[in-house]
C-alpha cells in the first residue's frame, strides 16, 4: 500500500491515495473490520482535482471561495462553491500549495476565476517537478509495498512513536532504535 492521507469529514472519513490503489486499499482495510459498521466506497471516478500553488495561492483561494483555508500541513476544509462542494487540502510543496477537489461543474466555474486572478495552468511535468523537489514519494514510481516509511522519509507524516499498539509497531520501533 502506498501513502494514504485520511481526511475527517462531518460524517465520514475520506482516504486519499494515488490512482489505482482503491481496490487494494479497500481489501486491506476490510480485513480489520470486525463488528464496526463500516462501508468502504471507491469514489475514484467522482470528481476532479487541481493543484494551485505559489506565494499568493492561499490569498487567491480565500478571495474566491470566501472561506478560510487550511493552515496546517495536510489540513483541509470543505466549502461550497457555485452551489457544489469543494474540498481544499493543503499540500506539501516547496511553494504554498493546495489540492482542490470537486465535481466538474465547480472546477469549471473556478478555473476562469483563477485565470482572471493571474493564475496560469502548468503541465504534469511541472507538477512532477514540484513533487520531487518537495521530497514526496509516489507509489509505483519511487516506492512500492516493500518499502518502510523510514526508507522514503515519511517518519513525521506516517509514523507515531508514542501511540499504543498498531500493526507493524515492532518493525517500526526496531528501525527507530
Across the structure, where does each feature detected by a protein language model lie?
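Basic, glycine/lysine-rich polyanion-binding surfaces/domains
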Residues: 1-177
